[in-house]
């Protein structure tokens, strides 16, 4: 079963060291509350026009069949599933690239997805009330997500994750 979710976006207003998981995660808590207030599962955050992460997940973008993600930096907490996505892409033959991703590219993406220990891999089908994707697949989990979701479930069943 493929899962879908709605997200909202916000300016990444957290302190300059989002890569440090510390007891003061108030910025992430406030961002998570924003999504809850809007009936969404996550808040996708942007800093100065560039994708950082979501309030409690890493964010990935599919473009022309490849999976793109922002590289680790002081603005991004590398989630426990961050490196797993690269492994799953290799396993199923999806090109994988870490690079800065502009907000406009996220909004124009073929697919957007989240990863975290609790969400596993989750398709984002709406962002700020706008459907993600293009054509007949608009607003639905896409083919890159479907392949990664299946690979994730296989790895989980084999207890390799």
Where are these regions (language model features)?
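Helix-start/capping segments and mature chain N-termini
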Residues: 1-161
């Amino acid at each position: 079963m493929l899962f879908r979710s709605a997200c909202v976006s916000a300016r990444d207003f957290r302190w300059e060291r989002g890569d440090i998981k510390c007891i003061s995660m108030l910025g992430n808590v406030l961002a998570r509350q924003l999504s809850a207030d809007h009936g969404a599962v996550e808040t996708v955050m942007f800093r100065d026009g560039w994708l950082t992460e979501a309030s409690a997940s890493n964010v990935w973008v599919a473009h022309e069949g490849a999976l793109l993600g922002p590289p680790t930096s002081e603005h991004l907490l590398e989630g426990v599933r961050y490196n797993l996505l690269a492994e799953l892409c290799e396993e199923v033959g999806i090109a994988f690239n870490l690079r800065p991703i502009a907000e406009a590219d996220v909004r124009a993406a073929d697919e957007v997805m989240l990863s975290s220990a609790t969400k596993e891999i989750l398709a984002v089908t709406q962002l700020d009330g706008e459907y993600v994707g293009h054509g007949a697949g608009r607003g639905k989990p896409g083919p890159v997500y479907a392949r990664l979701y299946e690979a994730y479930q296989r790895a989980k069943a084999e207890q390799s994750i």
